[in-house]
Amino acid sequence: MEPNFQALRKEFPVLARKTYLNSGSYGALANDVKAAFEAYMEGRLLMGANWDAWIAKNESVRALTAALLHAVPDEIAVTASVSAGLNALASAVDFSGPRNKVIVSDFEFPTNAQIWHAQEPRGARVVHVRCAPDGYIPLENFAAAIDEQTQLVAITHVCYRNGAKLDVPGIVRLAHARGAKILLDCYQSVGSLDIDVKALDLDFAAGGMLKYLLGTAGIGFLYVRESLIQSLVPTNTGWFAQAEIAAMDITGNRPASNARRFEAGTPAVANSYAAEAGLKFVLAVGTPAIEQRNYALTRRCMQRLEEIEWPSITPTQNGRRGMTVAVPSRDSGGLSAQLLKRDIVTSHRGDNVRASFHFYNDEDDVESFVAAMRDLRGSFGPR
């Protein structure tokens, strides 16, 4: 049975006041997530420290993330951010041999390129796969870059600037055929698309809770394929990455046998309350239904933008796009500000305004956005 999306809108108070199209930056706050924050604060006020409950909450986040990704909990590290998870992973990779290339693309969020460039003093060679003239990155561009010297292909699932979605299955096949590992940054897709790390045959995946997973900043995840964990020993570590946390052993580094070895210090307790509530909400609705809903909304938005002669630069095919509709503007910051004056919340990256849709949006949100864009086209249209 399809979820009652109109009823679910009532769980997000901001929707009564705003046309909220900014989930690709920060998801709308659900009543359940607000209540989870309040439960944490109430516990702090009445009990002070409650470590047993807090660790259990962190483990719940691990288990729920595994369920979302079709993984197992031992393959999930609960991290402070994508940056923290990738830094831990990078510290475990050996670049001293001939297989020292890292492939990234023009679609990457800065973190996913910067961290690998930071490994260059350790021997890494970072190669960028460029866009084609049409603004997309076809599979053949990756085929030309990935070779037998490639250690890792580190790619985004959905580009944060233009909403384009890479051909992940095709890139995975290319990488594995040449003996390379694959890392997927799915921050711009997880929670809005149905992601199965096993079906995609991923080696690593990273994401966070503040966008389509409805949680908050300061908490994320790193998925590591179970068969790879023992071969990777991060030097970027901490006491919560140890096999026996409570041993307080200062005589050596003895990492956990599972993906917890990619964690570091004390978990972000308050954030785990929010993340758990957000994950439960998304799982209850179901990512297959969410994906179908989001594609319908973004398709309608792109069609309506065509009608007002201000087309999006986001690819039109479902297989090539995520849930962000990117619209070019000669003053994207000014356009986003003018939309906000009309109670339409968007974001801007580069020359584009981003309208990021989630299951709690509806057709009226599309029409409000397009009507405002029609009015503002003369002042803020494309160059």
Task: Identify what each model region corresponds to.
Residues 1-383:
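Pyridoxal 5′-phosphate
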